[in-house]
Amino acid sequence: MTESETTSKKVNKRVKPVPKSTKAGLIFPVGRIHRMLKNKVPLKRVSILSSVYLAAILEYLASEVLELTISQVSIQSKEYHNVRRISPRHLLLAIKTDEELDNLIRVSTTIAGGGVIPYIHEVLKKVEQKPTHPQQKQTIKSI
């Protein structure tokens, strides 16, 4: 064999690199999160395990929010037929209905186009008052 044939065989035997996300069994990009963490940490020394852990947490939170949002869309599609898109309104309602996510996101986040949570204060609701005096009963009946 010539030298060029042996080097070409060595190149063909080279194993393709496997992404860190695949090794960890995640969808979120571990390598990108690792790079971003290294840019933010002053000493530039970050363990790859911390990146895997952070990617797993972010993936879990994203899946939780998406699951709750899909349930909001299905609830609204029963009221209004053929709702097939997730809107900022659905996202807001999903986050506000879950107590833990609401506590996590409440302080620093505003969802553009989300609107407000439907709520009517008890004072503003119409309540029939019972008349206390007999004269009030007569005036109400006469009207």
Swiss-Prot record:
Keywords: Chromosome, DNA-binding, Nucleosome core, Nucleus. One of its GO terms (cellular component) is nucleus. It is found in: Nucleus; Chromosome. CDD domains: HFD_H2A. Gene3D superfamilies: Histone, subunit A (1.10.20.10). GO terms for molecular function: DNA binding; protein heterodimerization activity; structural constituent of chromatin. One of its GO terms (biological process) is heterochromatin formation. Its main location: nucleus. Pfam families: Histone_H2A_C. Belongs to the histone H2A family. The nucleosome is a histone octamer containing two molecules each of H2A, H2B, H3 and H4 assembled in one H3-H4 heterotetramer and two H2A-H2B heterodimers. The octamer wraps approximately 147 bp of DNA. Core component of nucleosome which plays a central role in DNA double strand break (DSB) repair. Nucleosomes wrap and compact DNA into chromatin, limiting DNA accessibility to the cellular machineries which require DNA as a template. Histones thereby play a central role in transcription regulation, DNA repair, DNA replication and chromosomal stability. DNA accessibility is regulated via a complex set of post-translational modifications of histones, also called histone code, and nucleosome remodeling. This is Histone H2A.z. It comes from Dictyostelium discoideum. The gene is H2AZ.
